[in-house]
């Protein structure tokens, strides 16, 4: 799996603003008096002091940079917590990294009709994302204007292990028809996340900066945990027609809502509830064909469909899943499809393959959670993402 990509989005906000999500975080943390709120503003380090553990980092950063304000009555009780009106916003991200898999397998067959195999898989994850979100905003119909920029750096590393077992059976001795069954155990990942953030605001009265490197040990937040993926089940069928055309089809199911998140001691994390509510079962279907057009050349074609793993109403709820995270953006993926065609050559000494692959999917991108109106409709319209990837693959080898 290759994570390398860049993404950019820009558009009007019609009054929606990330600052209101920050304000909701402060409200949800139970700030009820001016003394409580001013204590957050005056604290030496609200990101590590135990009295502020219930305050999400992003909410605290917004309050301490003037993006979140409060009104209170003559008794000091807070009557309103609010942000700014967003004019327009601009987002950019750059991602790098990959998941590498190393397989160790054994296999055997019985009478060339019953084939059995087992594979031990070892995985290595290395992922880095830098993102920047900037917003122009106003108050009182433009009488006061300002802007802010939120930069996030997120890195995760990990290793995992799983076991795959499967069988292929030719039920009829003189027929090329075959079917297969395979089961993949959950992948047990040991993960380590490291992230930091900088929020800078430019307001009519003054400017503020909150750099988490100045408050966190080692300059970043570090979190070690376990992720256990769901079981995966696979069935396949295949045959040969006329001695020259190979056909195969494959179906796979994986219930993403069964993914487990645990701390290093094996205790379930808060984000587990969000996994169950926002992820769902994924269905994958593949078909392929290869035909020999001569003794040396063959042509190939294939199609792959994969359903979306995310429910249509999913959103990123930072206070519930992990209140130390400051990257509010999220992407709700739709189904994914891929089409490929290829040509193969098999000579006495040299063999070669060339293939073209077209991979495409859609998604809804949100720079932040804008919430719902009274009718239950999203206040922030998503950015419609159309992702297309074209690949030309070439392989050449020599027989010894």
Please provide the spans of the model-predicted regions.
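Outer-membrane beta-barrel porins/channels
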Residues: 2-400
